[in-house]
Curated annotation (Swiss-Prot):
Main location: mitochondrion
Location in or out of the cell: Mitochondrion
Highest taxon of the lineage: Eukaryota
Location of the transit peptide in the chain: 1-59
Similarity comment text for this entry: Belongs to the ribonuclease III family. Mitochondrion-specific ribosomal protein mL57 subfamily.
Protein name, UniProt field: Large ribosomal subunit protein mL57
GO cellular component, one term: mitochondrial large ribosomal subunit
Quaternary data: Component of the mitochondrial large ribosomal subunit (mt-LSU). Mature yeast 74S mitochondrial ribosomes consist of a small (37S) and a large (54S) subunit. The 37S small subunit contains a 15S ribosomal RNA (15S mt-rRNA) and at least 32 different proteins. The 54S large subunit contains a 21S rRNA (21S mt-rRNA) and at least 45 different proteins. mL57 forms a heterodimer with mL44 and stabilizes rRNA expansion segments 1/2 at a membrane-facing protuberance close to the point of attachment of the ribosome to the translocon in the membrane.
Length: 210
């Protein structure tokens, strides 16, 4: 089945490597392309001390999350080392789910059911841009590990950093959930994230009365 699929795409398999067969004079091994072919890229890396300092800023102590490899994974984006090092993406969906619950609780505690946001509102509240804004108070750039491709000799766009830093925030929530439990994760969210997400948020004119 894999062979048929490759043939449909104009690819051929030889000695377990995939080749593009359209021009055998310039055959290239897909997956073997040198990482430095695009000379325009922006790399961020950090030391163990940088990561420890970041976790100290977030939690008040670097060893709140005792596993060093987990600490490094949370600040590592999948683009770093071409995904060969453990990265934070597997934690993001769990972190986002916990943040959603905390946001909903925040509005339920008001006792005014007309203020309960729709799911679309919740997603807007924890958009990458807003989560990245939360991360700024911890100076994540000192610990982040990632590689951003560039179209030219310019700095990466702000939206690129938003995706990187928001994944760190969601990863932090998730790792607290897995290491310390749901109650601790909710407390961390409420104390360090929710107030920042909601303070300047303007809801669309959609009121949901149940």
């Amino acid at each position: 089945m894999l062979t048929r699929h490759c043939n449909r795409l104009g690819l051929q398999i030889e000695n377990k490597f995939v080749f593009r067969s359209s021009s055998w004079n310039c055959v290239r091994r897909i997956g073997k392309i040198a990482c430095n072919e695009n000379k325009y890229r922006y790399e961020m890396t950090s030391t163990e001390e940088d990561i420890d300092s970041f976790f100290s800023r977030v939690f008040g102590e670097k060893n709140y999350i005792s596993d060093k490899s987990l600490r490094e994974q949370i600040v590592t984006h999948k683009s770093y080392k071409h995904g060969l090092k453990r990265y934070n993406e597997p934690f993001v969906s769990v972190g986002n789910a916990v943040i959603d619950v905390c946001l909903l609780n925040h509005y339920l505690e008001s006792g005014n059911f007309s203020t309960i946001p729709s799911y679309k509102d919740l997603v807007n509240l924890r958009s990458p841009a807003r989560l990245a804004e939360v991360a700024k108070k911890w100076n994540p750039e000192t610990a982040t590990q990632c590689i951003l491709p560039l179209k030219g000799p310019n700095s990466p766009s702000s939206s690129s950093f938003e995706k990187i830093y928001s994944s760190i925030v969601s990863g932090l929530v998730a790792v607290v959930y897995f290491q310390k439990g749901g109650v601790e994760a909710m407390n961390f969210c409420k104390k360090s994230i929710i107030s920042d997400l909601t303070k300047d948020f303007v809801r669309p004119n959609t009121v949901h009365n149940q």
